[in-house]
């Protein structure tokens, strides 16, 4: 039985961890995940999906704010793991830790060397890519730059958003890891170096990126909205108040960027730099998420054809 240390945080990571837990070839000695966070207006404490799964299986949990130089690092290195598996962990691993194990493998949600970094799925959708994927790679000190063990891809559908693609890629990543790890550990599967000249990066989404630019084409704005749903969520402005936009559909029509060109009891169509978008699900400031019909029956009632949003 191969003894592993698992490191990860979101549901993507938990799906990979569950696959390892269900496989008798591996023993998880401990998991390292991000600290619990206070979320929402009530500041409720939320544990990570990886921590929740570890609690259910009675696995030792470590949650350092920063792994490097921490007491947890000393404890983790004392576990005697053969190797490390990471998936969307969110921190660099100290060289001391990498050198203490026989192997360290990362499950990364992109087709490397494209989209190294923390938000590959967001960028794949926002950039209008036709496919996304997962790469199993060796871990080195440089971010997502290690040799590649295996790759798998899947089409990005127009119905996909970050949430749906996360779910698909988590399953692909889990299965790809479990399929490739035995051959990798036996030496049968030889890792392939990345072409570093082709590397692109996907840094964490900034607040500025959340704001929609109505001068872009309708396809670009459509991709941007999907690439922010369900988090951090794209937004525009209506009378100086933030209006989050969760879902929209491509539509025909022309007008000034951000201009209301169609308004009925059931639809609101906004012009873009090329074409238009019909808004489907929105969230006004201080209100819950709602259908466009409910929005038009409330705050959106005063909107008229010719009005411009986003200012």
Curated annotation (Swiss-Prot):
Record-linked CDD domains: FMT_core_Met-tRNA-FMT_N, Met_tRNA_FMT_C
Official protein name in the record: Methionyl-tRNA formyltransferase
Chemical reaction(s) catalysed: L-methionyl-tRNA(fMet) + (6R)-10-formyltetrahydrofolate = N-formyl-L-methionyl-tRNA(fMet) + (6S)-5,6,7,8-tetrahydrofolate + H(+)
Protein species of origin: Streptococcus pyogenes serotype M4 (strain MGAS10750)
Enzyme Commission (EC) number: 2.1.2.9
Keyword list, A-Z: Protein biosynthesis, Transferase
The keyword Protein biosynthesis is annotated on this UniProt entry: yes
HAMAP family to which the protein is assigned, alphabetical: Formyl_trans
Record: residues binding (6S)-5,6,7,8-tetrahydrofolate: 110-113
InterPro entries in the record: Fmt, Formyl_trans_C, Formyl_trans_C_sf, Formyl_transf_N, Formyl_transf_N_sf, Formyl_transferase-like_C_sf, GART_AS, Met-tRNA-FMT_C
Sample GO molecular function, one term: methionyl-tRNA formyltransferase activity
Matching Pfam families: Formyl_trans_C, Formyl_trans_N
Disulphide-bridged cysteine pairs: none
């Amino acid at each position: 039985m191969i003894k592993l240390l698992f490191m990860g945080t979101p549901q993507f990571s938990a799906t990979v961890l569950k696959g390892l837990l269900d496989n008798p070839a591996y023993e998880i000695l401990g998991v390292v995940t991000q600290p619990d966070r206070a979320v929402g207006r009530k500041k409720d404490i939320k544990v990570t999906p990886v921590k929740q799964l570890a609690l259910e299986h009675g696995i030792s949990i470590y949650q350092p704010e920063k792994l490097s130089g921490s007491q947890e690092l000393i404890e983790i290195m004392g576990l005697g793991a053969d190797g490390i598996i990471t998936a969307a962990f969110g921190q660099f691993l100290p060289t001391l830790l990498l050198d203490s194990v026989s192997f360290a493998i990362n499950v990364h949600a992109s087709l490397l060397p494209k989209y190294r970094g923390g938000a590959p799925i967001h960028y794949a959708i926002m950039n209008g890519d036709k496919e996304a994927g997962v790469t199993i790679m060796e871990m080195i000190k440089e971010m997502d730059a290690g040799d590649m063990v295996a790759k798998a891809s899947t089409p990005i559908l127009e119905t996909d958003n970050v949430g749906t693609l996360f779910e698909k890629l988590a399953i692909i990543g889990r299965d790809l890891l479990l399929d490739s790890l035995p051959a990798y550990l036996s030496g049968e599967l030889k890792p392939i170096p990345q072409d570093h000249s082709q590397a692109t990066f996907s840094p964490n989404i900034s607040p500025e990126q959340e704001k929609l630019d109505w001068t872009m084409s309708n396809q670009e704005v459509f991709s941007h909205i999907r690439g922010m749903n369900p988090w951090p969520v794209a937004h525009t402005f209506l009378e100086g108040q933030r209006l989050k936009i969760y879902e929209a559909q491509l539509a025909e029509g022309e007008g000034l960027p951000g201009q209301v060109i169609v308004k009925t009891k059931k639809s609101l169509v906004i012009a873009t730099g090329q074409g238009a978008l019909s808004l489907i699900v929105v969230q006004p400031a201080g209100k819950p998420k709602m259908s466009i019909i409910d929005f038009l029956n409330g705050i959106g009632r005063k909107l008229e054809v010719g009005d411009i949003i986003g200012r």
